[in-house]
Amino acid sequence: MKKKKALPSLLYLVFIVLLPWGVSSSFNKCLELWIKNWWNTRQSETLLTDIQEKRILERFIELEELSLLDEMIKGKLKTHVQKPPTGIHKEIIQWVKINNEDHLHIILHFSTNIICLAILSGSFFLGKEELVILNSWVQEFFYNLNDSIKAFFILLVTDFFVGFHSTRGWELVIRWVYNDFGWAPNELIFTIFVCSFPVILDTCLKFWVFFCLNRLSPSLVVIYHSISEA
């Protein structure tokens, strides 16, 4: 009876896993036009912020210096420069457009991900019964295994998430999250996350093995330590 109930629960879990991709692609198309209109209206109504003005000014000075250097190299520099060359003006306009596009994509990705998380949370809440059935079936399946296979699976999971090569995997995960939300990469945050999160997770797993698993099956803990120390 439990196995019959577990199949719909398993299908529901697959639906929840695939849901974010479907929602993301659908809402990206729906929200893109609306956010573009909102962003362009906002940009026309509110002038540039102090940060944007500072960045544009820095970019303008950089381009002007490069242009003057180029003129000096060519020997065409005049003693008095009345106005910046038209090339700089075009470069600044192009840079502002690219900057606006970047901001637009950040808002679009962030909005889509927030909607995905809200729908995903609602799906977990509404499908609580199916997930409880699936959880009980997985626990029953796990407890019916012999201690050696249990220890093997526990060791496989722990090594996969907190093993020697897991740091590279966690780095890819945090980079993927940043790219998915449209945020600019931050190497400092990546380093802190990779150095701290696996350690915290490893501590939690050790706590579970020593205090929780030891009460359920002491022989399993002995086998687990024998395999891990081999």
Swiss-Prot record:
Subcellular location: Plastid, Chloroplast inner membrane
InterPro entries per UniProt: CemA
Job of this protein: Contributes to K(+)/H(+) antiport activity by supporting proton efflux to control proton extrusion and homeostasis in chloroplasts in a light-dependent manner to modulate photosynthesis. Prevents excessive induction of non-photochemical quenching (NPQ) under continuous-light conditions. Indirectly promotes efficient inorganic carbon uptake into chloroplasts.
Organism from which the protein derives: Hordeum vulgare (Barley)
Gene name tied to this protein: cemA
Catalytic reactions on record: K(+)(in) + H(+)(out) = K(+)(out) + H(+)(in)
Bilayer disposition of the protein: Multi-pass membrane protein
Keywords (A to Z) from UniProt: Antiport, Chloroplast, Hydrogen ion transport, Ion transport, Membrane, Plastid, Plastid inner membrane, Potassium, Potassium transport, Transmembrane, Transmembrane helix, Transport
Name of this protein: Potassium/proton antiporter CemA
Domain of life: Eukaryota
GO molecular function: antiporter activity; proton transmembrane transporter activity
Coiled-coil annotated spans: none
Pfam families in the record: CemA
Main location: plastid
Membrane-spanning segments: 7-27, 106-126, 145-165, 181-201
